Each structure stands twice: as C-alpha cells, then as structure tokens.
Swiss-Prot record:
The lineage of its organism: Eukaryota, Metazoa, Ecdysozoa, Arthropoda, Hexapoda. It is found in: Nucleus. The keyword 4Fe-4S does not apply. Belongs to the AEBP2/jing C2H2-type zinc-finger family. Residues 852-868, 1244-1254 have a biased composition (Basic and acidic residues). Residues 1458-1467 have a biased composition (Basic residues). InterPro entries: AEBP2/jing_C2H2-ZnF, Znf_C2H2_sf, Znf_C2H2_type. Expressed in the imaginal disks of the leg and wing. Its main location: nucleus. This is Zinc finger protein jing. Residues 1-102, 150-180, 199-225, 250-360, 568-618, 633-669, 711-735, 776-806, 826-1096, 1242-1269, 1397-1486 are annotated as: Disordered. GO terms for biological process: axon guidance; border follicle cell migration; central nervous system development; chromatin organization; glial cell migration; imaginal disc-derived wing vein specification; leg disc proximal/distal pattern formation; negative regulation of transcription by RNA polymerase II. Keywords: Chromatin regulator, Developmental protein, Metal-binding, Nucleus, Repeat, Repressor, Transcription, Transcription regulation, Zinc, Zinc-finger.
Length: 1486
C-alpha cells in the first residue's frame, strides 16, 4: 500500500472503536499501533482508547503522513513481509478504502479496544525511530517520484451497487474499484531494504507486539494465516516466517499488456474469494468479481513471485475461508465509512459493522500512494472523476472485525441503514498528489468502497472538517455539490427527482460519457437548498453512489482517451458549478470558480488569495475537468516564479447575472480538450477567481499550432460579442485584421470551439451578464479568451484565456487593486465597443483577440490597473493575449509558465485557424507583460497595440488584414493615450506615422519612441529588448525588431516586440508572415490591446528605450530566416549568458551558498559537498547550490540529496581510460561497456566503425529527441545561421591586426604628439601645442617644449582609463579601420610617416585639413580598389597611409555625427606634395 495519508487533524473518529473486538484491528490512523507503517501518530492512542466514542483528534496539523503497506516491524527478512500481513494490509487498504487506516500487520484484531491502544502505545517507542526513518524514506520516494507509477484503474466489477452483499454472497462487490499495483519494484525493493536495515528494531517491536497480543484474547498471536475465523480476533503479528519476495517489475508494453498469468502464476490460481494470501492481492481482489484468475486489464502490475511460504499461506488462507462465513469476505470488501464525528456518537455500532471481517480479504496490497501535496499532477481522470477527494483522512476509519457472524451481518445491515447519514457531505477527496502525474492512481479505495456506499473513499464530513455531518431539519443529508462527477450526479439526481425517475434510470438515459457535466445551479430546483443538494432517502443515496461510480468509470475511460488526444495535462481550468466557465485552453486553465456554492468553494473563497494550486482541489470545478491542472503552490518568494494560479474572490460587482437557467442548458458537448464550462455564468456570487499566473511562454511563438491548440482549448469561448464573426483564433487577437473578419477565415478550428463557446456566450447573454459585464468588466486584458461568457466584450472577459478564466468582472475582482469604477467605465466602454466592434471583442477567441477594446476609459483603467500588477501576474497567462499582462509577472512567469503554457498551445498549431494566430496568445501575453512594463498610459496604448500586434504575431499578418477597421475604433477610444493610429502600429508607437512597412518610418519611429519614454520592461523575460516577449516567434521578433520593432519596440519593449511582430506580418519588411505588421495588429488590437494594457500595467522595471533599440538592432539577421516562418518559441534572450547562475561555471568550484571553495577535480568537489554540505544537514534536506532549480527546496531524504548533488559535481565521474577518448560516464557499468567496446572494435579490425562503437549507445529517447534537445540548448530554438568559415577567420584576424596597429597591445594606446605651434609663456619658457596622433581621440593640448626641441611627445593611455567620449571615438575609429586594408602604419602618426619619408627632423606635418578634406573618402575607395594601392615603402605609399588614416578619422567623424551621406566613391585627390610644407616655429598652424 503506498503510503496512506493519515490526517490526524482530520478528526479521526475511530469507528473501529465502536465495536471493541474490531477496534484494535481498525487502527485509527493516528494510532501508534500502526507500526507496520512506521508512521506512528502520536495522538493515535486516544482514538483507540474509547471503543464507543469516536474521538476527533484535535491535532491541528493537516500534514499527511505517509504510511507504507509493508510492515516494518517484521523481524523476518528485510524484504519479507508476511503474506498474511501483506494481505491484511491490502485488505484494509482496499476494503477500508480511503476511510480505513491501514490495519495491516500492525493492527491486531484484539478483543478490547483498550488493549489494542495499550499495545499500540507499547509498540510506539520501539517503532518510533524506525517509523521516522521509514517516513523519511517514504516521503523522499514520493517526492522524487521514485515510487514509480501507482496506477489504479477504476473499473467497476459487475456486481457492485449493493450497499452490502447478502451474507451468503461471498463475492466481493463487483464494482469496487480495483487498483493496479505499482509498476516499479525498484522503489519497493528499496523500501524493503530499508526495512532490513531496521530489522533488529523490528524484531524488538515484534516481541513487544507478541507480548501485548498475549494480553489480549487472541487465539493465535503469530498466526500467519491472514484471516482466522472471525470469531476469534486474531492478532496478526507480522510473522517473520513469511518473507515476501521483492516484487518483480513487469514492463508494460503499450501494445501487449503482459498477461497476468504469465507474470504472476499465483494470481492465476487465486481463489476468487479474495481471501487468497497472494501478495498481489490487489489483482486477486479485482479478479474476485469476475472469478477469473486474471486481473482485469492492468498494465502495470508488480507481482511478487510465488514462494513456497506464500503458497503455504495461500492454502492456509483458503482453509480459513472455508471456515469463514461468507459474510466476512463481503464485509471486508466493503469500505468502512467512518461516520462524521457528530453522527458517530449516535450510531457507533454500525460503523464497525461495515467492515465486520477481520482481515481475510486481500485488498490491494499497494494503496494509492497519496503524496505530499502538489508533488504531482493528479491524473485527469481522477481529477475529474474523483473530485480530488481528500485522502488525508484515509487511514481514519479502522477495519472493524465483527466478533461473530451475527455481529457482522447486523453490522452490515446497520451500515446500510446508516449509509445515508455517513455520506460525507461534499467531502473532498483530495487525491492530491499521486505518485505520478502521468498515471492516474485510482482511489485505492475502492474495492470496499462501493458496497459501503463510499465509492471514492470519501471521508466523512466530519473528517473532512465539514460541519454538515448531521441531517438537516428534514432529516436530509446535504451533499455538498460534489465537484466533478459529483456535480454531474447532482444534476442527474435533480433530473431524476423532477422526472420521478430513479437515479439509475436517469443515468442510463443520459450517459455521462460526455463529461458534459452541467451543474444544475438552479436553486429553485428540487432538493437544492442553500445551494446544497440533499439526499432525501437512503435509496436515493445508494442510487447516487452507484451513479457516481458509473460516472467515474465512464469518465475514466473517456478521459483516458481524451488524455492521449489532449495535450500534456495542462492546467485544467477548474470551473466551478456556478462559475461562468470559459473553456480554457488546455495550457493553464484558469480555475474559474465563481461559484461559492460548494463547500470547496467556500474554502477557496476563504483562501481566495492563496495560490490555487492547493485551492484548485478545493474548487469544485476542478473535479469537472478531465485534466487536472498542476498548480504549483504559489511561491511568493522573489526567487520563485509567480504562482501559477492565483485565486481571488470575484468582486460582487462581477456580472453575476448569468441566469442559472442559461447555465443549466447543456452546452454542446465539449471537445475532450475543451473543458465544458460547467459553470453557468453565475458570476453573481463573488466567486473565487483562480487565474493561472503563469505567464505565457516566453515568446509566444506564433506557431500556428500552438495557437490553434489554444484556440481549440479556448474554442469554447463563444464569440463574446454578439458579433456574427466567429471567434477569431486566439492569436488573431493581436492583429488589427483580427477584427471582425478576423476569425472568419481562421475560424476553422475556432469555429469548432466556437460551437460550445456560443453557448457560453448565450449563457452570458441570458444571464444578462452582457449588459452588466460591460460595466463591471473592464476590457481587462485579463479576460481570458476562453471564457467567452463573461467578457464585457461580449464575453471577452470570460475568455478563459488561460489566465483569466472568469468573466472580466472576475478578472477585475481578481485584481482587486484595480479601481473598480474605472474598470467599470473601461469595461463599459470596452464592452460597448466590443459590442459595437464585435470584431475585436469577438476576437476574444484568440488570446490576443481577447484583449478588450481599448477605450479611452480603458486607458484610464490601464493606469488604474497599474495597481493590478499582482493581478496581472495572474492574468498574464490568460492575458497572454491581453496585452494587459504587461506585468513582468508575465515575463518572469513566462519563464515558468513558459513551458506549461506554450506546449499546450503548440499542439494545436493546425487547429488554430489563424495559423499564426495561435502562437500569438503566448506572444500577446508576453507582449502584454512587457507592454505592461511600458509606461502606463501612453505606453499602454502603444503597448496594447504592440501587444495586440505581437500576439497577433504571425496570425496577425493574416488576421490583421480584414479586421483592422474595428481596431480603429478601438484606437479612437484609445486616443487618449496615443493616437494609436487606427490600425497602424500607431497605437504602439504613438508616433503618428508608423509606416511600419517603411524601414525609414521604423527608424524614425525608433528614435521617436526611444525618446518617447522609458518603457517599463516587464522583465528580462520579455525577451530581447523586451520585444521578444511580445512576439513569440523569433522570426516575428526578428522582423519586428529589424523593421518595426523599433517602432513598436522602442515605445515599449513589449510594445516594440508586439508591434514588431505585428508590423512584421503587416510589414513587407519581414517577408515572412511572421507577425502581423504592428500597424495592422496595433490597429486592430490596439484598442483591445490598449484596453487590456490598461487593465494591467503592473509597474515594471524601467528601461531606457535606447537600450531596447540597441537590443533590437543587435538581433541577428539570421533570426529572420525561412526556418522562422514557422514560429519557434524563443526560449532565452540571446545573450543571457549568466542567467542567474552567475555566468560561466568553473569545474571544481563549489557554488554552494556561502561556499566558493576551489577543488582540483570534480571528484574532490563531490567529496567536499558530501562531507561539508550533505552530511552536515540533519534534515529537512535542501540543496543550496546557487542556481540549482530546486534551490532550498526541502526534502526529507538525505539519499535524495546525496544523489542530487552529483549533478552539481559532474555526475559523470567515470572517465574513459582509453587515450584520446574523453567520454565520461555516470556509472561504472557504462564505463566498463564502453571500454570493452574500444578493445572489441580493435580486435575485430573494425577500425572503420570503431568510432561509432566507442560511443556509448544512444538511448532511444535521446535519438528521438536529440534534434529537439539540440535546438533547445540554443538561445533560439530556431536555427542560427552563423557561417563560420575561413573567410570569417581571416576577417577576425584582420580586425585583430587592425586593432594592434592602434593599441600596440596591452589595452593601451600610445599617442605620438606633434608640436603644431609654440608660444612663450610668462616665465619665458616655451610651450608646444601638441596634436596627438592617432587623432580625434584625445584633445590637443599645450605642453612644455621638449628639451631637445624635437617637438616629439609621446603619451601612453590605458583604454580603460579613458573618458567615455574618448572610448567611443576609439570604437568608431576601429570600426572604420576594420573595413580598411591592413597597413601596419594605419594609425601611425602622419607626421612620423612624413618625417620618415621626407627625412625632415622637424617632422613636417601634412596639412591635416587639406589632406583630410581631400582624402577623407580615400579609404573607402581604397577598400574597393585595393589593387591600386600597394603598400610599398615608396613615398606614395606613405602618403596613402596618411590619407587612409585621415579617411578613418573623417569617416569616424561622420559616423559620430550620424551623417552618412558622403558619396560612396568620392574622387580621389592626390595629396599635395609634402616637400612643399616648411616647418616653422611660428604660432600659426603650419
């Protein structure tokens, strides 16, 4: 059993206590008695002590503790777990399901509860250390996911549905969910090894147990038999004699699942009665229903090979079965439901009855490993179906073994009677982290659960901490709308009531396969009171449970299918029942729980500002989505990325209008990837908004696919506005063209999405949200596209762009900082505009499109939204389209979210009709964020435009074309900020002329914008010069940067990138479709963009535009390459070298926090880290290596840390011993194979292939992904064209030589001074006016005359010590010199050359002015006519040198003055003869 989570705080009512005989068997989770799990809970004893009074442990700590199934107290071999005990554990795990504590080995079925408590206490000290270690190991394993996948498949066995089978029936309830055992044995073996280490302790514990058991009336203290006749409570002490062999790992091949029979012969023969002692009880239990020896469709099964001991045990188990009354097995299978604490007092007896039989059944050996929260993503199936029910209380209910058959039968009946009462109201089964994200763990619960009527292992309300355990005045038990399947069932239940049908009939008539859960939110409906559904009678309750299970199963299959189709589990938006849901793009689903109906919601609202990661589960909606989003816990620390999801409560102002009827109507079936929005647009209640904060991928790639995908996911978003135009693709949002026509052409995929979306939209309409929305909803950029229902723009707010799932109003509320009034105005204007300009509004489909139109008011909003930065972060995802996500959060988040959000979109490239449009969402996000950085208002508008543009990105180019017009209106509204030239990028640049297409324009824009203002750069992430973030695709970025980027970019880094991308698409400059030209984009989106920008302009770092410009210029031309016409995500800004790791890392240096010791080799570094940094930690363990991705993340496992630090010390410690082969390997074995290959190759004379054979075999995965990985390592994923060949080498050498002519090495320049004039000073001495050469670097000056009157002065100046202006001149001189032919005297003093040539001691000086003017341009000629000029020693050559030098000067001068109009090839003027120059001492210049 993977570790159970025992929540001591959850209030363990020991139901077991109710019946004394069973009480010991049922260990309340906290009870220390559970030594086998080694996680002894200190307050456990109290539960045990009072048999009849269920005690709620006051332990406030909610931390789940992991309990492992195997008994650590075993004295036997390290790996051996007595099969009996294993079975028992399995049984309890499966049987009690979540509610049951593991009553495995440690649990003795003792007659008196008190005795067991005593025993537990006595064992506690002995097992405590071991338990601690085991706990550490378990946690480590779970955290490192080493445990492997515990995959439970929830398959109902045919018979299920009865609360408790008749005593006569031996078969276990068929519909118990069977769960597969873990696939990885490595982890299990590891655990067994740990156990062996603790062997001695175990032996001691065992003795203690036996002693304790002796005190109890146990017929066989050491009975290995799993279940003795129930009559005699057997203390099943772990019997050392039954070692369980380490599990064999069964590899799963997708094509042919291994037959269980082959792998586990013992399974083949397992009696279907479930009492089999085989260690793989889980499979046996599953087989029980079908009576076949095979376990149903398990792909991963870890089965222990049968050993003689096990066979013996099995036989014994069979024998025991003979004696055992049939009831027991069924009882075992039943899951025990621990009654809510309040109820428990009234009906103590029934609870035990649920699990009357002691231990006979072998439930699944491995219970679903509940991990620490947030380690892993819940498998979508579970998320949807299981409603993330809390497992924390899993161990709570104890297995109650009935002393007599009668007791068992009675108990079963009692259980049936009380089932309704026990129903956990709205318990949330928070299966939060299952060991693996990829595999769904079934609620292990379940084998016994169904009969008990608790299919999900739901915990009692009491345990869950729900106050609603007691029936209401009418004797009905409220079922908090169970999220997910639960809500669906509710719906069915209500329908059934209305139609007077039985629930099952209803279910049958309406298959839940569609996942179309519609939550009936109508409060007027039958049975709904206070938004709670009350189950009227036990029959209905049973039906409810059955249907719930059915729904789960259907969902599971469906989800499995869906999962493959859908993208990696993106964060699913969890839509609350009442929430206006927008379908969210898979990537980050915004959790829109606007609904506070459910208890979960209420919780969520309480934690409104928590990150949703945990809250997600709270949110009812979560269950609904098949895909569970992984939400990371928010880490606010600066080091952490912004929380993925921020939950905020929605302001009441949010249009709560969606009328429940509208909500009720069933939406078109959502595509698997689109979450149907279950939530009706019931925004009215202040719902919680969870917005994923993750920014979109760094640079939203314009990849059509991604956009398409996003679009698909968002597809549900109906066009929010009434506009007829179909929702434009996500991306379309940016392009101005996107406007009304916008989505039409691209609409293809969008349309599909649209189908469902329109419903949402209708909902919104119906709910009157629209009018309302327009006011409350700001065109917050945040509104996520997918949530079509909400947006002021129609539902633009609703778009559930991943970030903003809820309606705009929600968004607004989410950003509480935003001033409401302004937002309202803005939203009104926005919504109005959107109505009027459905185009943009409609666009919402695409992220970018989402951006609300920007109206002047909106702009105001933007300013207000400055406040929003936090919100923005959350938005940023959703906004990605909305430029509003300027927030740096986007950028920083972008990195984090980058992957999450980008991938999702990318899959749907084809889907995005816009084609390019898809990528835009991310881009828009980024741009938005950068934009946001931009200065608020103007910037906003510009940014908006740019972001629109950028988001439009490639899409824009297409989309832009038609819709630009609508953009204009937006632009007008935006006027306030910038004249946003209608469609043209104007908005972004604000410069009136944006000739985006004209480079000239761009240039002017560039300057214009540069001066325009310091833009806030959202963050470095925003990308190159911030522009990057805007245009996701490097291509668009490059184009934008090159052509318009300046125009847009400078205005805002984000803007620039956005506009650049937009401009690209528009502009011819980038021939690639890449981004729509900013004009178009900005034009159309600009209003929207600006609106969104207004929505969130978080404060950002201010960066001088000049910098941005420079960066954009520096973007390599190669970025504009054909390969980029397919947008690629740019992962890192190009020159980000240091990237937080402090620049280049050196081998042997320890970068541990506060430790920078240098070691000769990596092996010494590893030793150092082990001794000084790992061994010195006492726990929790954390890696403090600066720059480590898990820096300071605590782990409970030292061994994890030991393994982890290897990655910092160079994990490949084994170097090939063959000379000339520098390969290193991470293991001795790999090295050995490699070295052998060297020699085998030579022996076999396969010299030709030796190279190949000497390399370690390339893993298949690497071969498959090698190319991808290779590109990933580059700063740009796209190919970089650097043609580095001999020509380049020569050029570099030339430059080095030219530099040497100037600097003479040593980073210093030696200046030769020529005396130009003399004067007599007051003291009677002479001073010379020295002109320094190389000239034009340092200023001339008067110096005392040289003693020898040579008038030769020298001065050596270090470049680093020069003034900035001087350095600039040196730079321009060199840049000019690099274009000249090499001449050793290039920078030689003209006078010196002249003297050498002419031989005049006085050093005749060439007439600088004359020569300079005449020869200014010579050099260029020289460049082109190099043949003409030979560097001979002749005087002409020297003259030429002088002229070339002067040309250098003149060119540099021209450059510095930015005058570049001199003719390309001015006529060559022969320099005047130097002999005519006569030196003189006169003050006049010679």
């Amino acid at each position: 059993m993977p570790p159970h989570i025992l929540g001591s705080a959850s209030g363990s009512s020991s139901t077991a206590a109710a019946s004394p005989p069973t009480s010991s068997a049922s260990q309340t989770p906290p009870s220390p008695a559970i030594h086998h799990s080694h996680l002894s809970q200190h307050n456990a004893t109290s539960a045990m002590s009072k048999p009849t009074t269920p005690q709620r442990h006051g332990n406030p700590s909610l931390l789940p503790t992991l309990q492992w199934p195997w008994n650590t107290s075993l004295g036997s071999t390290s790996t051996a777990v007595p099969a009996a005990s294993a079975n028992k554990n399995k049984r309890t795990a499966a049987g009690s399901g979540a509610a049951l504590g593991l009553s495995g080995e440690g649990s003795c079925l003792t007659g008196g509860g008190a005795a067991s408590a005593k025993k537990a206490r006595s064992d506690l000290p002995g097992s405590f250390d071991a338990s601690k270690r085991l706990k550490v190991a378990a946690m480590e394993e779970s955290q490192t996911k080493i445990t492997g996948f515990f995959k439970s498949q929830m398959k109902p066995s045919p018979g299920g549905g009865k609360l408790s089978p008749q005593p006569g029936q031996q078969s276990n309830p068929a519909n118990t969910l069977t769960m597969s055992t873990p696939a990885t044995t490595a982890s299990l073996n590891k655990y067994f090894n740990i156990l062996s280490q603790l062997k001695e302790q175990k032996a001691q514990q065992q003795q203690q147990q036996q002693q304790a058991s002796k005190t109890l009336p146990t017929p066989a203290p050491v009975a290995p038999v799993p279940s003795a006749p129930p009559v005699a409570p057997v203390v099943v002490t772990p019997s050392p004699s039954l070692p369980v062999p380490a599990l064999k790992k069964i590899e799963r091949s997708n094509k042919q699942p291994a037959k269980i029979a082959q792998v586990a012969p013992n399974l083949r023969k397992t009696p279907s009665s479930g009492s089999s002692g085989s260690s793989s009880s889980s499979s046996s239990s599953s087989s029980n229903g079908s009576n076949t020896g095979k376990s149903p469709t398990k792909k991963h099964v870890a089965i222990a090979p049968r050993t003689p001991e096990m066979k013996q045990q099995q036989q014994q188990g069979k024998a025991a079965m003979v004696y055992r009354p049939p009831v027991t097995s069924t009882a075992l299978k039943q899951k025990q439901i621990s009654p809510p604490a309040p109820v428990a007092a009234h009906t103590p007896a029934p609870a035990p009855a649920l699990n009357p039989t002691p231990a006979p059944a072998n439930p699944t050996l491995y219970q679903l490993p509940v991990q620490l929260p947030n380690l892993v993503q819940l498998p979508p199936q579970l998320a949807a179906a299981a409603n993330i029910m809390q497992l924390n209380n899993v161990a709570k209910a104890a297995v109650a073994a009935a002393a007599t058959n009668n007791a068992a039968a009675q108990a079963a009946q009692a259980a049936q009677a009380a089932a309704a009462q026990y129903f956990l109201n709205g318990t949330v089964f928070k299966l939060q982290q299952v060991t693996t994200a990829t595999t769904t763990t079934a609620t292990t619960a379940t084998a016994a659960a169904a009969p008990a009527g608790n299919p999900f292992g739901l915990l009692n309300l009491a345990t869950a901490g729900n106050p609603f355990g007691l029936p209401n005045a009418n004797g009905q038990f409220p079922i908090e709308a169970i999220p997910g399947a639960g809500s669906y069932l509710h719906h069915q239940l209500l329908l059934a009531r209305q139609n007077n049908m039985s629930l099952n009939e209803t279910m049958a008539s309406n298959s839940c396969g569609n996942m179309n859960f519609v939550n009936p939110l109508n409060n007027q409906q039958v049975g709904l009171k206070d938004n709670k559904l009350y189950i009227v009678n036990s029959a209905e309750y049973l039906g409810y449970l059955m249907s719930l299970q059915i729904a789960l199963n259907n969902q599971q299959h469906q989800q499995q299918q869906i999962i493959s189709a859908t993208q990696p589990p993106p964060l699913a938006a969890t839509n609350n029942n009442s929430t206006n849901t927008a379908t969210q793009p898979p990537p980050l689903a915004a959790t829109n729980n606007t609904n506070s109906n459910t208890a979960n919601n209420s919780t969520a609202s309480n934690s409104i500002n928590h990150n949703a990661s945990n809250n997600l589960s709270n949110i009812n909606n979560t269950a609904i989505q098949p895909q569970r989003a992984i939400v990371k816990p928010p880490l606010h620390s600066s080091t952490q990325p912004p929380p993925l999801v921020t939950i905020s409560s929605m302001p009441a102002c949010s249009p709560a209008a969606a009328s429940s009827p509208a909500a009720k109507r069933s939406l078109p079936a959502a595509k698997p990837y689109q979450k149907r929005l279950t939530a009706k647009g019931r925004v009215g209640t202040a719902p919680i908004i969870a917005t994923p904060t993750t920014p979109p991928p760094l640079v939203p790639t314009s990849a059509t696919k991604e956009l398409g995908q996003l679009r698909k996911s968002t597809g549900t978003t109906g066009t929010p506005t009434g506009t007829p135009t179909p929702t434009p693709p996500l991306v379309s949002i940016a392009p101005s063209k996107l406007t009304p026509t916008l989505s039409v052409s691209k609409q293809g995929p969008t349309m599909k999405l649209a189908n469902s979306a329109p419903d949402l939209f209708d909902l919104v309409k119906n709910s009157k949200l629209v009018a309302k929305v327009s006011q409350p909803l700001t065109p917050l950029p945040f509104s996520s596209p997918s949530s079509s229902s909400n947006g002021s723009h129609g539902s633009h707010g609703m778009r559930s762009s991943p970030a903003l799932s809820t309606s705009n109003s929600c968004t607004l509320s989410a950003f509480s900082k935003i001033k409401v009034e302004t937002t309202e105005l803005a939203s009104q204007t926005g919504s109005l505009t959107s109505s009027s300009i459905p185009t943009i509004s409609l666009k919402p489909q695409s992220f970018a499109g989402q951006l609300p139109k920007r109206e002047p008011e909106s702009e105001t909003d933007t300013l207000k939204h400055d406040l929003l930065p936090d919100c923005t972060n959350s938005n940023s995802n959703s906004n990605s389209c909305s430029s509003s996500t300027y927030s740096h959060s986007v950028s920083s988040a972008a990195d984090l979210s980058l992957e999450a959000s980008t991938p999702a979109p990318s899959p749907s490239p084809s889907a995005s009709p816009s084609g390019l449009g898809s990528p835009s969402p991310a881009a828009s996000n980024l741009s938005a964020s950068s934009r946001r950085a931009a200065s608020q208002t103007d910037m906003l508008s510009e940014l908006v435009t740019s972001s629109c543009i950028s988001s439009g990105g490639d899409d824009c180019s297409q989309a832009t074309d038609s819709p630009p017009m609508p953009a204009l209106p937006l632009a007008k509204s935006e006027d306030a900020t910038t004249p946003i030239s209608t469609v043209s990028g104007g908005s972004s640049s604000g410069s009136s002329n944006y000739d985006e297409e004209d480079d000239k324009s761009v240039a002017s824009l560039e300057t214009h914008q540069t001066h325009k203002r310091l833009r806030d750069l959202p963050t470095p992430e925003s990308g190159i010069g911030g522009s990057l973030s805007n245009s996701e695709s490097s291509n668009s970025i490059a184009d934008a940067i090159s052509s318009k980027s300046a125009s847009v970019g400078p205005p805002t880094t984000a803007a620039s990138s956005a506009s650049s991308s937009a401009s690209d698409s528009n502009s011819l400059a980038s021939n690639a479709p890449s981004p729509a030209s900013p004009e178009d984009c900005s034009a159309a989106p600009s209003p929207a963009c600006s609106a969104s920008t207004t929505g969130s302009i978080p404060p950002s770092t201010v960066v001088d535009i000049a910098m941005v410009e420079a960066t954009s210029k520096s973007l390599p031309k190669s970025a504009i390459s054909p390969i980029l016409s397919q947008p690629k995500t740019i992962r890192f800004p190009a020159g980000a070298g240091a990237s937080g790791k402090g620049g280049k890392r050196h081998d042997g240096v320890c970068y541990w926090d506060k430790c920078n010791k240098k070691h000769e080799s990596n092996s010494k570094l590893l030793d150092h880290m082990q001794t000084h940094h790992v061994n010195t930690q006492t726990g929790p363990f954390a890696c403090l290596w600066v720059g480590c991705k898990v820096y300071n993340k605590e782990s409970c496992s030292r061994r994890w840390l030991e393994r982890h630090v290897l990655s910092h010390g160079g994990s490949k410690q084994f170097k090939c011993i063959v000379e000339g082969c520098g390969l290193r390997f991470g293991s001795q074995l790999a090295l050995q194979k490699h070295v052998n290959n060297h020699f085998n190759a030579t022996d076999n004379a396969r010299e030709s292939t030796s190279k190949r054979t000497s390399d370690p075999p390339v893993p298949k995965q690497l071969r498959k992904n090698g190319k991808k990985l290779r590109y990933r390592r580059q700063p740009f994923s796209a190919r970089m064209f650097d043609f580095f060949d001999t020509g380049i080498m020569e050029g570099l050498q030339h430059r080095l030589r030219q530099i040497s002519t100037l600097t003479n090495g040593a980073q210093a320049i030696e200046f030769q001074g020529q005396c130009m004039m003399r004067r007599r000073n007051s003291q009677g001495g002479y001073e010379c006016f020295v002109r320094w050469s190389p000239r034009e670097i340092i200023s001339d000056e008067w110096l005392p005359e040289c003693l020898n009157r040579t008038r030769q002065h020298t001065k050596v100046l270090h470049i680093k010590q020069m003034r900035p202006a001087e350095k600039t001149r040196v730079d321009s001189l060199l840049s000019t010199a690099f274009r000249l032919r090499y001449d050793s005297h290039l920078f030689a003093d003209d006078y010196n050359v002249n003297e050498q040539q002419v031989g005049e001691a006085s050093g005749s000086d060439c007439d600088e002015d004359g020569d300079g003017d005449q020869e200014e341009e010579d050099l260029e000629d020289q460049d082109e006519d190099e043949e003409e000029d030979g560097s001979s020693s002749s005087r002409s050559a020297s003259c030429e040198t002088v002229s070339s030098y002067q040309q250098v000067l003149s060119i540099a001068k021209l450059q510095m003055q930015q005058r570049r109009k001199h003719p390309r090839k001015p006529p060559k003027v022969t320099p005047p003869a130097r002999e005519k120059l006569v030196p003189t001492d006169a003050l006049v210049p010679i």
